[in-house]
């Protein structure tokens, strides 16, 4: 199994190199996926395990998408990345996913992260998500998925002490999440019948939850979260541990 590292090599090769090296130093295998769409200014020397061309081929094969006639490179790479992440996880080759991006890369990476089940470590390192003007673009991902975000404050293109620190912290974060993640600690693939309880009062909810616990029923409270999104991947209704 490997930690999947995602980013645009023609923009963030240096930061990606640091992340890869640090993850490997901690004893994990890596799988680098390039999501470049031709907007970067450098010609990278680092070779990815999965190229953006391979993602484009996957998008065409699985979804019939190809650049042209209103279909953008961003859409093609997004669809290809979703398919690749789905395949890697389905084959038992993915144990975590980290992406270091700007705005475009975040919007390409998040749909793939959203496809991963509850509990699987997923980390987005980006400064784009902290901008209030863009909040609506990310609501569907963060409200319904356990995606961890490291807000970078500064851009991560190029290299300086700040970017280096962010890359190292991000690599240590995803490594630590993977090291302590256990399928036995999360109700993965354990479908159970359950009752849904709607409520308006916290006091009432606490009383009901206490009574349920007396009967040995595991429960969870959520504010406006669609449980169907969690159950869709066999997470047993996102039950507590």
Region annotations inferred by a language model:
Residues 12-24, 31-32, 37-50, 172-238:
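Glycine-rich phosphate/diphosphate-binding loop of Rossmann-like nucleotide-binding domains
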Residues 108-138, 148-151, 203-206, 224-228:
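Short, acidic/small-residue loops that bind anionic groups at enzyme active sites
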Residues 65, 69, 133-199:
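Cap/lid and interdomain-hinge subdomains that line or gate substrate/regulatory clefts
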Residues 43-93:
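Phosphate/nucleotide-donor binding subsite
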Residues 1-2, 26-29, 91-96, 117-122, ...:
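Short coil/turn connectors at secondary-structure junctions
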């Amino acid at each position: 199994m490997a930690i999947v590292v995602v980013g645009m090599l023609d923009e963030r090769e240096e930061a990606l190199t640091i992340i890869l090296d640090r993850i490997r130093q901690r004893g994990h295998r890596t799988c680098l996926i390039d999501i470049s769409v031709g907007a970067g200014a450098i010609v990278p020397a680092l070779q990815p395990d999965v190229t953006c061309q391979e993602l484009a081929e996957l998008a065409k094969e699985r979804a019939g998408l190809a650049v042209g006639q209103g279909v953008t490179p961003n859409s093609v790479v997004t669809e290809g990345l979703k398919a690749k992440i789905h395949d890697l996880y389905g084959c038992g080759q993915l144990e975590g996913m980290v992406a270091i991006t700007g705005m475009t890369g975040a919007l390409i990476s998040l749909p793939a992260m959203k496809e991963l089940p509850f509990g699987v470590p997923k980390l987005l390192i980006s400064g784009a998500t902290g901008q209030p003007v863009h909040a609506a673009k990310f609501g569907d991902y963060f409200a319904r998925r356990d995606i961890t975000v490291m807000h970078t404050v500064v851009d991560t293109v190029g290299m300086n002490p700040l970017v280096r620190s962010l890359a190292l912290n991000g690599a240590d974060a995803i490594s630590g999440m993977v090291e302590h993640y256990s399928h036995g600690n999360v109700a993965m693939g354990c479908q159970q019948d359950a009752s849904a309880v709607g409520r308006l009062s916290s006091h009432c909810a606490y009383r009901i939850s206490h009574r349920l616990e007396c009967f040995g029923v595991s429960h969870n409270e959520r504010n406006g979260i669609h449980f169907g999104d969690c159950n869709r991947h066999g997470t047993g209704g996102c039950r507590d541990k």
